Amino acid sequence: MFNFYAGAYNNGEVNYNTLNIELKHPLEIANNFLGYNQHSFYGDFATKGVNHNTINIKNDLTTTDLSQSYKDALNIVAGRTLEGNADYNKVYINNSMSTLPVYIYTAKKNLLNNQDFYPSSANNNKVSIKDFASFRNLTVLTEAKEASYNTINYNNVQSITDASNIDKGSKIIIRALDKANHNTIDIKNYSSNAADNAYLIMAYNEAAYNKIIINDTLFGVASDKREGILSIIAGLSNNGHDNTLIINNLNLDEYKNNNSVFIAPSAITGLSEAKSYNNTLYRREFKYI
């Protein structure tokens, strides 16, 4: 188990740090007394704010050996804070692979003394992944009280899983307690066969002016039963408006379970006063295979 930090402070802010990872020899996946493999890369860890931090990753992260524990994880955390802002943090991954499930956070909630702590804001953060393969799950997550102008880009990315019961799904989720506005998820040349695929921009009070772009993408199901869940929603909220979903050449495997595919520019919660309006779907080449 390894933890790498570009910066850390337990009573204040940590800003403007860069962590460059270019391994000459990938991290080994091995049996050990813990019974699992878990490694973490932190741009910053602080209590009152993490801003303008960058993680750059090149070359393979792990050996090609497969580990099979539900606790396995490779965590890439651009910014983690108990309060304050988590803005302008960036993660770049190029020409790499991992046989551990990969979890990427530009900002994340923290559990302390059975209480959840969220950054006040997660704005103008960026994740860019190019030429990358995860042989387990791949998840990118942004969590804050407010989240705006965040961008997540995939280009030539694979999330390859088996049909085991440790499949936790592959997801991109931007989630805000209050508002999530002007965020973009742009996926190109991507494939995933995770049991649970979720690509969501969501907030409790308002999700507006968000955009999800899907180009040349395949979603499949590793299970022999051909059962899984796929959700693509650009604005999930009690007030979702002016969101856009653009689909160009999306291929779906056979999902045999009912109520398994949800694709929409906007969706509302079950509250009677929830509303959704001025949302747009552009679709070209959408088919089952």
Mark where each language-model region is.
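Surface-exposed loop/turn motifs in large extracellular/passenger domains
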Residues: 1-30, 36-260, 264-289
